[in-house]
Design a protein with these regions (language model features):
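General beta-strand structural signal in soluble alpha/beta enzymes
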Residues: 31-33, 64-66, 122-126, 162-163, ...
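Ferredoxin-type iron-sulfur electron-transfer modules and their immediate structural context
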Residues: 251, 264-417, 425-507, 512-635, ...
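A structural-propensity feature for long, helix-poor, extended segments
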Residues: 2-4, 125-164, 268, 278, ...
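Short acidic, glycine/serine/threonine-rich loops at helix termini
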Residues: 6-12, 42-47, 105-109, 134-138, ...
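Active-site-adjacent bridging/hinge elements
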Residues: 85, 206-215, 255, 463-477
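Thiamine diphosphate
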Residues: 1-63, 80-83, 87-179, 182-232, 491-507, ...
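Active-site cofactor/cluster-binding pocket
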Residues: 1-2, 7, 11, 15, ...
Length: 815
């Protein structure tokens, strides 16, 4: 069976077979059941053999598992050496790419070209990690004259192409490559740089297996023709040149024809750029004449992780290296929880360009850090004595603002965590840009040293400015960092800023969707903690029940805090409770619904709690056990428009109608982003999306106006690119409102086909508001109590050109 039925006597197929023999009567053979392939596990010939070996045993193991190492319940079968059943003469090719570079799409084109224009059989499998654009992808392609029935990934390749240079130290790219095979690396390194940047083990394999080794600077070619980071056609041309599956001239002609079919709807400009990339690819391909000494060298790039905590070393690193399938069951957490802040260990290094800060023109507005989707650029405020021993490249300027008088300021990039989207540079308001995107190799060394110094020597100055001001919010540590979201993502900036405002006391129920995938994909979590160990608690149930899930969490916290208040009341009535403890207990009871006061009084209670022990009060232990509830929790439900407008609307409506104090943030991309861009009720009239390829024929559901009809729900419509201060006001008011709050955030998305690129997502949001496409407003029931109109329209009368805005997005322009 390829399923697990918890609580059953056996899996479905096993039970069906047992039942069939039992009902037939007569002779019944020994029936053995087991499980394979769970969690996308590969099912290889060696595993099949292990099943037969088990059946040949004197006492075959029943209810076995194959493909995992179960050292907890000991159900697994021992697997022997791997072997291949691929027909002789089959060519196996492996392509390692990065999400959104076009590698997977190009390989699908290649399979189609070869399958349609040769007598070869073709097969393709594609493996991805759970990150969005910028994540790891592996394409497994096989071609041969015999039918290919190998339903498993390639274990021994003739051709390996690595489309991202950073991968050479992150993955074992050449594992299983055949003697005399071909290896193609996308990089701009000459032989000297290859000596320095390739690990010794990779050089050993190249030389010992006599590989044909080629390099190509595909990024340079793609940028020269205007494709940016889309290197797929360059690398595909190199593949057809080297693999010799089809005569090269014929392959080029077929590739160009495929380009016209694939990109024709996006206009002649895109088609011509891709054709130019094909034409320039071969001249950029260079064979490397490597020395024979590589076979035994011990010198090369080394990445050390000596100081990693156990969970990182034993679970995270193997999974990140694509070796998670080798982990035993005992390595996993029994309850499904995982530590926070683990994305900081990834250091993916996938950016092509990094922002370079110009201190001479910087006005210290911090808008660049405010909009960063990955919290990979931050302000640093330092006391002069904290700068002793700083690297020469660690340039600072006098900090502006009376609160920062006498201090120094700089903008610091996290070079290995940045995705290079350019959002920070594009929103810079300086007349002469204070951030300019520069090639990775010109920035990496200095910025790594600068970051290491800042983290080791300079404290976070979170108490100096009002956290609800734009600049003040950016002096708070972001408690969402380095997520797996797309470069330029429109969703994560909202959540990141939210964690800077309330993160140390947030509890989040997340609907399944983009925000749950970039929010907590095993094995790493981008939600982190501050220096005191406080940060968001995060959980995900299902797609459809996030509102109910969050409502249940909120109700549980409410009930438990009521119990704590009861204990505090009883403690106050206890003889002998006086002085600082009594003041602290009474102060907390009077201010338990005030976030800052409840935290402060709670700390005072804990500091004096031993007084209860001294007077033999039995309440001390009970209060201590509930200490995490002293600070008022900020309960949030996160989800996309697919959840809020469609799948989970019934639950959302129930929660909003309840009148309870809970906050909802809807990240509105106007499509089901996580599953590839299907139309939702948030998709506007005329927008092209999956299931609406001729343009959606109905209008957008007005979720905000529907919620306002209750009269007691706080509702806000926000757009970070258009008005950052309005975003802060809405977040502050919604969290402070003693009742249900709904915030609908416009989130530009890669599925919208923004023609300027995702680095201009903030500009796109601004254009949407200026054109009247998206409105900014706040509906605050508290104003009605004062006799005022609760509705405030924050966006101005449209001044932009709606047609110009629509023409800038493929979802409309293609229509």
């Amino acid at each position: 069976d390829r399923t697990k039925e918890p609580g059953s006597l056996g899996e479905p197929l096993y039970q069906d077979v047992c039942t069939a023999f039992q009902e037939k009567g007569g002779y019944t053979p020994n029936i053995v059941g087991g499980r394979y392939g769970l969690g996308s596990k590969d099912f290889t010939p060696a595993m099949v053999k292990a099943v037969y070996d088990n059946l040949l045993g004197m006492q075959p193991k029943n209810h076995f598992t194959v493909g995992i190492e179960d050292d907890v319940t000991n159900t697994s079968l021992e697997i022997g050496p791997s072997f291949s059943t691929v027909p002789e003469g089959t060519i196996s090719c492996l392509f390692y790419g990065i999400g959104s570079d076009g590698t997977v799409g190009a390989n699908k084109q290649a399979i189609k070209i070869i399958g349609d224009n040769t007598d070869l059989y073709a097969q393709a499998y594609f493996a991805y990690d759970s990150k969005k654009s910028g994540g790891f992808t592996a394409s497994h392609l096989r071609f041969g004259k015999s039918p290919i029935k190998s339903c498993y990934l390639i274990q021994s390749a003739d051709y390996v192409a690595c489309h991202k240079a950073a991968y050479v130290t992150q993955y074992d790219l050449l594992r299983g490559i055949k003697d005399g095979g071909t290896f193609v690396l996308n990089c701009n390194w000459d032989l000297k740089a290859l000596e320095e940047n390739l690990p010794a083990s990779m050089k050993n394999t190249i030389a010992r297996k006599h590989l044909k080794f080629f390099t190509i600077d595909a990024v340079d070619v793609a940028q020269n023709v205007g494709l940016g980071g889309r290197i797929n056609m360059v690398m595909q041309t190199a593949f057809f040149k080297l693999a010799d599956v089809i005569p090269f001239d014929k392959a080029v002609a077929l590739l160009k024809e495929s380009i016209k079919k694939t990109y024709g709807s996006k206009g002649d400009k895109i088609v011509n750029m891709n054709i130019a990339a094909v034409d320039q690819a071969v001249s950029a391909l260079h064979e490397v004449s490597y020395p024979a000494s590589w076979a035994d060298t011990t010198e090369g790039a080394v990445v050390r992780h000596d100081s990693d905590p156990d969970y990182i070393a034993n679970v995270v690193r193997p999974i990140l290296a694509q070796n998670g399938g080798d982990l035993p069951v005992s390595a996993m957490s029994p309850d499904g929880t995982m530590p926070n802040g683990t994305t900081s260990f990834e250091k993916r290094g996938v950016a092509i360009m990094l922002p370079e800060w110009n201190p001479e023109t910087c006005v210290q507005c911090c808008q660049c850090t405010f909009v960063c989707p990955h919290a990979a650029i931050r302000p640093v405020v330092a006391q002069p004595d904290e700068l002793e021993g700083a690297p020469e490249s660690f340039v600072t300027i006098d900090a502006k603002g009376k609160e920062l008088k006498g201090m120094k300021f700089r903008i610091q990039v996290y070079p290995e965590d940045c995705l290079g989207c350019g959002s920070c540079a594009n929103v810079c308001i300086s007349k002469e840009k204070s951030l300019v995107m520069k090639p990775l190799e010109t920035q990496m060394a200095d910025q790594k040293a600068n970051l290491a110094f800042a983290e080791a020597n300079i404290s976070v100055k979170s108490q100096l400015m009002d956290r609800f001001s734009l600049k003040g919010s950016q002096l708070q540590q972001p408690l969402l960092e380095f997520s797996g979201a797309c470069a330029g993502c429109g969703e994560t900036p909202y959540v990141k800023v939210l964690t800077q405002l309330f993160g140390e006391r947030m509890v989040v129920a997340n609907a399944t969707g983009c925000s749950s995938i970039w929010g907590a994909s095993s094995p790493t979590s981008p939600y982190t903690v501050n220096e005191d160990g406080f940060g968001p608690s995060w959980g995900n149930s299902l797609f459809e029940d996030a509102a109910e899930y969050g409502f249940g969490i909120m109700s549980g916290i409410k009930q438990r805090r009521a119990k704590l208040a009861d204990l505090v009341t009883k403690a106050l009535a206890t003889e002998g409770v006086e002085g600082e403890l009594k003041d602290a207990l009474q102060g907390w009871l009077d201010n338990k619904d005030d976030a800052e006061a409840s935290r402060s009084y709670g700390e005072k209670v804990m500091a004096n709690l031993e007084t209860l022990d001294e007077i033999d009060c039995p309440l001390a232990d009970q209060i201590y056990d509930m200490a995490d509830l002293f600070t008022k929790k900020s309960c949030w439900i996160f989800g996309g428009d697919g959840w809020a407008y469609d799948i989970g609307y019934g639950g959302l409506d129930h929660v909003l109608a309840s009148g309870e104090d809970i906050n909802v943030l809807v990240l509105d991309t106007e499509v089901y982003s996580n599953t590839g861009g299907q139309a939702s009720k948030a998709t506007p009239l005329g927008a092209i999306a999956q299931f609406a390829m001729a343009g959606k024929r109905t209008g957008k559901k007005d979720l905000g106006r529907m919620a306002m009809t209750y009269g007691y729900v706080y509702v806000a419509s926000i757009c970070m690119g258009a008005d950052k201060n309005q975003v802060l006001k809405a977040f502050k008011e919604a969290e402070a409102y003693k009742g249900p709050s709904l915030i609908i955030a416009y989130a530009p998305c890669i599925n919208q086909g923004i023609r300027k690129g995702m680095g201009k997502s903030m500009e796109e949001g601004k254009l949407a508001v200026q054109a009247g496409y998206w409105m900014l407003y706040r509906f605050n029931p508290e104003l009605a109590k004062e006799g005022k109109n609760p509705f405030q329209l924050d966006s101005k009368e449209p001044t932009g050109d709606l047609n110009e805005f629509l023409s800038g997005e493929n979802r409309y322009a293609s229509l």
